[in-house]
Amino acid sequence: MSFKEITPQQAWEMMQQGAILVDIRDNMRFAYSHPKGAFHLTNQSFLQFEELADFDSPIIVSCYHGVSSRNVATFLVEQGYENVFSMIGGFDGWCRAELPIDTAY
């Protein structure tokens, strides 16, 4: 089993149906702005994530530009998560698509 790649628009539509979007960017960038409703997935927050997500929950991984999210998506599949997606373009693509964001400013 592997992950699938989806566009930011597809990710947003899936989130409206209950998918979990995890943002793996660094603390400072996540705090400044991130996709609306995103969970900040870090080594420190992984246990909290495990409590939040079922193994069959749709999980979308977002990073800066859509590259490192593939590695985390692969890791999640290896951990037993069955419905994993990597978001093409990452947060940069999300912003270009003019999708909702939460910001600190």
UniProtKB/Swiss-Prot annotation:
Keywords: Cytoplasm, Transferase. One of its GO terms (cellular component) is cytoplasm. Its EC number is 2.8.1.1. Pfam families: Rhodanese. The active site is at C63. Its main location: cytoplasm. Residues 15-103 form the Rhodanese domain. The keyword Kinase does not apply. The keyword NAD does not apply. PROSITE patterns: RHODANESE_3 (PS50206). It comes from Haemophilus influenzae (strain PittEE). GO terms for biological process: glycerol metabolic process. This is Thiosulfate sulfurtransferase GlpE. Belongs to the GlpE family. It catalyses: thiosulfate + hydrogen cyanide = thiocyanate + sulfite + 2 H(+); thiosulfate + [thioredoxin]-dithiol = [thioredoxin]-disulfide + hydrogen sulfide + sulfite + 2 H(+). Transferase that catalyzes the transfer of sulfur from thiosulfate to thiophilic acceptors such as cyanide or dithiols. May function in a CysM-independent thiosulfate assimilation pathway by catalyzing the conversion of thiosulfate to sulfite, which can then be used for L-cysteine biosynthesis. The gene is glpE. GO terms for molecular function: thiosulfate-cyanide sulfurtransferase activity. It is found in: Cytoplasm.
